[in-house]
Amino acid sequence: MSWVLSSLFGLMLLLAGCSHNLTSAYRISEPLAKGARVAVLPFENLSGKEGASEKITEYMVLALQRGKNIEVTEFGQVYEQMRRYRIRSATLLTDAQLDSLASGLKIGYVVTGSVLDYHETDNPYLGKIPQVSINVRLIDCATHQTIWTGVANARGDQSETVFGLGAVRSLEELAHSVVR
């Protein structure tokens, strides 16, 4: 199986050990070819927290760039093509927009998604507890089909033990771990 799918599936397995709220639907018809070109589109921000989608998108690009079997398109090129074809929402792509991105960026796959929750909750005993929730889709540009999808939810206090040990206190740190 390709590195991209293994990484995304591994992310879901990792979070399964940390979360009772993890939901993941996994489907794949065939593994990605070695050297597949992937573009990460800007995640849609449904959380209401300013800057959340930019951070999650950046973390996703960094996580995928660690792989040796795929090539991740530079975000500046992705943004330029989205402007060129007037694509305003990366989560509501038409087939024509997907075809335009695929030919303009010379990619075979698109990663897109939404930031559902990105906030901190006050806890009188532990202070601020971060919470992050995202959904991610991997789309095959040739068939216009979603070949993988997943949802990940995490709270900073999920791995907490006695006296607050093990709790994640930073929203950015939790977001980074959710994407990994």
Where on the chain are the PLM-derived regions?
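Feature marks short, surface-exposed loop/turn motifs that line or immediately flank catalytic pockets
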Residues: 47, 119, 156-158
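Short, solvent-exposed loop/turn segments at secondary-structure boundaries
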Residues: 50-52, 123-127
